[in-house]
Amino acid sequence: MYLRQGDVQRALPVLERAVGLCQSWHIPLFLPIEVAILGLAYVLDGRIDAGLALVEQGVEQQVARGRRRRLAPAIACLSEAYLLAGRLEEARQRAAQAVDLAHQYQQRGNQAWALWLRGESTARQASPEVELAAGHYRQALALAEELGMRPLQAHCHLGLGNLYGRSGRRDEARAELTTALELYRSMEMSFWPPQVEAALAEVEAR
């Protein structure tokens, strides 16, 4: 929860303890995903190389256990880690894989997050396909609204706002960013509002 709220410093000790407990208590079922999430937290904390190595390790462990049903969230973590590291094509490929796996096993929440990652990895390309990226965001948003995933709803509106802002579509960008800001504030997610406010200011300055 802390990680999705953007509070990496509070998330890290919780995740490190979870991995330690899985190892010391010999709980292999949950270890791969906990390792992957911890790696993502390290990447968010700026420890790119160490974090990527951990996420990749978590995915490899999950693959080795042959539990494809549990693979989608680990693959999504890897996609997000690659995204943060600027490895956009790898992020896009892994996001597509996570979407397919989540759809196959009817994991709609995982599918929603993976669709958002498809939007992000498409939108951040040097010459993004705007409508393709927007379509991924809107698919993710529709699922997030249906499932009550409000943090993801906010992320989708933020992604759309940034995408439209870079494309010169000021009115649409302003509407999406304003919605994102309202959602983040209503959930007291303090990490993102400054980013949204900066994006809004940039849109107004264009």
Residue ranges and their predicted role:
Residues 1-206:
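Helix-coil-helix junctions within alpha-helical repeat/solenoid scaffolds
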